[in-house]
Amino acid sequence: MIEFVKGPVAYVCAEYITLDVSGVGYKVHVPNPFFYREQDEHVIVFTHHYVREDQQTLYGFRSRRERELFNKLLSVSGIGPKGALAIVASGDIDALIDAIETENEKYLTKFPGVGKKTAKQMALDLKGKLSELAPDYVPNEGLFAQGASELDEACEALVALGYSEREIAKVRKALSGEILTTDAYIKRALQLLLK
């Protein structure tokens, strides 16, 4: 099994990166390939070697924690490697764990390729099994029931305003403990972004 691949980024496209490891180019499918575009130095990508009878694919992650989440998602019926990669790419790990633990289908169905049936299956298969990914996890009782949909709407508004996923993730983390209206979330987020 390949634990990680280390080397300079030789090529970046929308689906994968190519790492030059001692003159051999490794094609690695990663959650957010353009994250690597800015890095000229050697990078370490923690990998999952996916083998099927007709293909072998390397999936790569910035941390072991991301890779472990990917592996856990693969164990869910109805989620394949592309779906698991999309979930890792588009979600905050702590918020995802909280949604699974609280069985928040509304949050889980926002991920690409996840419908109500798959969201229920995720909660059923993974609830209580993600503690090693979040050792300090404390359930946010009521967070998703009260305020989360407003925060989601505010984040969607920030996307429409042209803010990057990275900027929105930082703001979301800062605002996740507050319970506000959508308008108040947007105002507060803009204040944080313009500092």
Swiss-Prot record:
Belongs to the RuvA family. One of its GO terms (biological process) is DNA repair. HAMAP family: DNA_HJ_migration_RuvA. The gene is ruvA. Homotetramer. Forms an RuvA(8)-RuvB(12)-Holliday junction (HJ) complex. HJ DNA is sandwiched between 2 RuvA tetramers; dsDNA enters through RuvA and exits via RuvB. An RuvB hexamer assembles on each DNA strand where it exits the tetramer. Each RuvB hexamer is contacted by two RuvA subunits (via domain III) on 2 adjacent RuvB subunits; this complex drives branch migration. In the full resolvosome a probable DNA-RuvA(4)-RuvB(12)-RuvC(2) complex forms which resolves the HJ. It comes from Exiguobacterium sp. (strain ATCC BAA-1283 / AT1b). The keyword Disulfide bond does not apply. InterPro entries: DNA_helicase_Holl-junc_RuvA_I, Hlx-hairpin-Hlx_DNA-bd_motif, NA-bd_OB-fold, RuvA, RuvA_2-like, RuvA_C, RuvA_C_sf. This is Holliday junction branch migration complex subunit RuvA. One of its GO terms (cellular component) is Holliday junction resolvase complex. Keywords: Cytoplasm, DNA damage, DNA recombination, DNA repair, DNA-binding. Residues 63-141 are annotated as: Domain II. One of its GO terms (molecular function) is four-way junction DNA binding. The lineage of its organism: Bacteria, Bacillati, Bacillota, Bacilli, Bacillales. Has three domains with a flexible linker between the domains II and III and assumes an 'L' shape. Domain III is highly mobile and contacts RuvB. Residues 146-195 are annotated as: Domain III. SUPFAM superfamilies: DNA helicase RuvA subunit, C-terminal domain, Nucleic acid-binding proteins, RuvA domain 2-like. SMART domains: HhH1. Residues 1-62 are annotated as: Domain I. Residues 141-145 are annotated as: Flexible linker.
